[in-house]
Design a protein with these regions (language model features):
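Short, acidic, metal-binding catalytic loop of nucleotide-sugar glycosyltransferases
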Residues: 21-31
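A conserved acidic beta->alpha catalytic loop
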Residues: 22, 38-47, 63
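Short aromatic/hydrophobic "clamp" motif used to bind/position activated sugar donors
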Residues: 83
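Conserved donor NDP-sugar-binding/catalytic core segment of glycosyltransferases
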Residues: 91-127
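Short, flexible, basic/aromatic active-site loop/helix in glycosyltransferases
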Residues: 115, 132-171, 528-538, 546-549
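N-terminal hydrophobic signal-anchor/signal peptide
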Residues: 271-310, 336, 343-350, 356, ...
Length: 647
């Protein structure tokens, strides 16, 4: 056998589906096998993939022991003369594999071959070619000098910026996303080092290949797409921890003496600096807008109070103690109302601000009405303060949108801003797929790729840039059939317009894409839309969990007599309060539903241990619960199963 393709999968079944379609095409005419090692995915990968790809050999692990170990599992069963280690979130050109194999025939000294990679938006991924880490390269990267001098042989050495991305080069490090190696080389140097859990294994293997006297090459002729659909996001603290831990391990393994000591010190420093920036950035993303809103709301109340006492109620003296307490409390209530109304969900819509302000007004006026007469100040200040808050928050958001600091979502615009590059048959399949996925109608029309342009098409792909401008297109779905993978990749690499690109293999059941290398990819699939997956419902579910837990704690003298085993009941209360459990959840542990915490009682209103229905019926109960979820659903089931809350 000439080639073995080894792919490690973890919870990216839709990306892997598209990847396998492209790999199968790239392997046509080659004596090849495809091996997929699944690291205990929980997204239903087995049921989804195994029937769809009977020619692929699957290895299903019962635990996730890391990327390196999974690759070694596949390698142990591989029969090919050459081994291609490939990430599941990639799409290959039809000639990628053939061209790489030809390169090895022409370069007997080659020990490994990487390839030019672009992200879903068509941008070159710099990790396609790298140098080995060293104190100086790390310092230049950390200090930002590599960004200031991206083509410098000295400052940009980490990503070898001085080497053209469009030419073949001898390099140090190849990316594990696409790494082709002769099996005889692996037999000589050994397999992946399993001490590297998720990152660094490609650096270590590249180092050992070079140390054995072989050369590592970067191949620019047949670019591939790498979506970055992995579960550990680059912007997370977990990514920082895993990445720099891997670099630390690499240095300790391969470097010696004072050089190693300096480098390890630099890595430790980098961990703290990067973690600090990451934590600060994540914190600002989460609380930045609410904090600014709090300032605007508080300011609005004080402005209205000053105007009110100056022009409306000149003779009224408002107690500073009341105002210093009331205004911050009312601001907090406003923010809570805004949060649970979805104002801080991804993709801002003005309707969210209107709804949030209206709900906040109702809550504030209700709270104000319950206050004793002695501590009330003025309903007018409250009402006009809310109105001014709305105006200022709206102005701030419009400014942020114009400065591109705030992502906006306009459903009316999105409905007609997607075009599909496909033949008529595939276009019908894609529109049906989007309909089944429960997405709003947003397809503007079809773009032709044939010799002639039919009357039903908006235009020809040769005029794609003009079509993007004419129809203000925000998203393009490329279908592999009327276009080859190579044509699709070349098309997105050559498109300068800022659009979202998505990809669909003819006959597949999903559409995948990613806007940038820093974001995990997204997908459209013919799956049910679950209410329980919506951010607003997840917040409401957590609110019910916490509210009931607090009620049970406050009502301790009563509830202690209403439960058969009060100690176990209150153990559940505190676990729910801590976020380790939820009052109501699924009756089945293995399903393809949105994840929620371990439940006290299940969707049948019984504890999991007491469910006697067949597994199929329990799964159906869970699907109904997830699909039709509302806050009332949980309350009804808790009332029904109240006597079992001690389980």
């Amino acid at each position: 056998m000439h080639l073995s393709v080894i792919i490690v999968n973890y919870n990216v079944k839709h990306f892997l589906e598209q990847c396998l379609f492209s790999v199968q095409k790239a392997c046509l005419g080659i004596d090849a096998e495809i091996i997929v090692v699944d690291n205990n995915s929980t997204d239903g990968s087995r049921a989804f993939l195994e029937p769809a790809f009977p020619a692929v050999r699957f290895i299903w692990n019962s635990s996730n022991d890391g990327f390196a170990k999974a690759n070694n599992q596949g390698l142990a069963q591989a029969k090919g003369e050459y081994i291609l280690f490939l990430n599941p979130d990639t799409i290959l050109s039809e000639d990628s594999i053939e061209n790489c194999l030809s390169f090895f025939k022409q370069h007997k000294e080659a020990g490994a071959l990487g390839i030019k990679m672009i992200d879903g938006s068509g941008k070159f991924l710099k990790e396609s070619k790298r140098a080995f880490p060293s104190p100086l390269t790390s310092l230049f990267k950390l200090s930002g000098l590599a960004v200031l001098f991206p083509r410098s042989k000295i400052f940009a050495r980490y990503h070898m910026g001085h080497l053209s991305e469009n030419e073949n080069h001898e390099v140090d490090v190849l990316a594990g996303a696409f790494m082709m190696i002769p099996k005889k080389v692996l037999t000589e140097i050994g397999n992946f080092d399993e001490h590297f859990f998720m990152y660094g294994e490609d650096v270590d293997l590249s180092y050992r290949i070079q140390k054995a006297g072989y050369k590592n090459y970067y191949f620019a002729k047949s670019p591939i797409i790498h979506f970055k659909g992995e579960s550990t996001k680059r912007g997370s603290l977990n990514y920082v921890r895993l990445f720099y831990k891997a670099m630390n391990l690499f240095v300790k393994k391969h470097y010696r003496g004072s050089r190693a000591g300096i480098f390890i010190l630099l890595i430790q420093l980098a961990i703290y600096i990067r973690a600090g920036f990451t934590a600060t950035g994540n914190l600002l993303k989460k609380i930045g807008l609410p904090v600014l809103d709090a300032v605007l709301i508080l300011t609005s109340f004080w402005i209205i109070k000053i105007l009110w006492s100056t022009y409306i109620r000149q003779q009224t003296n408002y107690s500073p103690h009341i105002l210093y307490t009331a205004f911050p409390v009312f601001t907090a209530i406003f923010l809570i109302a805004a949060f649970y109304s979805g104002l801080y969900d991804k993709g801002y819509k003005q309707s969210q601000l209107i709804r949030s302000s209206f709900i906040a007004a109702l809550m504030l006026l209700s709270v104000y009405a319950l206050l004793p007469e002695a501590v009330r100040f003025s309903r007018g200040i409250l009402i006009f303060g809310i109105l001014l808050s709305f105006v200022l928050m709206n102005i701030m958001r419009q400014l942020f949108i114009s400065w591109h600091y705030l992502e906006t979502r306009n459903e009316n615009d999105e409905r007609r801003q997607t075009i599909v590059v496909a033949c008529e048959k595939d276009f019908a399949a894609i529109t049906q797929l989007m309909k089944q996925a429960g997405m709003p109608e947003r397809v503007l029309g079809r773009v032709e790729n044939g010799a002639t342009t039919s009357a039903s098409a908006l235009g020809h792909i040769a005029h794609l840039p003009n079509l993007i401008k004419k129809y203000t297109v925000k998203e393009i779905i490329f279908c592999e059939n009327s276009l080859s993978y190579k044509e699709i990749i070349n098309s997105i690499a050559g498109t300068k317009a800022v659009v979202r690109n998505k990809f669909h293999a003819s006959g597949s059941s999903s559409i995948v894409g990613s806007d940038s290398k820093n974001n995990s990819g997204d997908y459209v699939a013919a799956t049910k839309m679950y209410n329980i997956a919506k951010p607003i419902n997840r917040r409401n579910k957590r609110l019910i969990d916490v509210a009931l837990a607090i009620i049970f704690i406050i009502g301790f003298p009563v509830f202690i007599f209403l439960q058969k085993r009060p100690a176990r009941f209150y153990k559940n209360v505190f676990e729910v309060l801590a976020g380790r459990k939820t009052w109501v959840g699924y009756a089945t542990e293995i399903n393809d539903l949105p994840s929620i915490k371990k439940p006290v009682i299940s969707s049948t209103a019984l504890p999991i241990k007491l469910n006697e229905l067949p597994a199929e019926s329990l799964l159906k109960s869970d699907e109904w619960y997830a699909t039709g979820y509302s806050a009332i659903t949980d309350l009804k089931k808790i009332i029904k199963g109240f006597k079992y809350l001690y389980y």
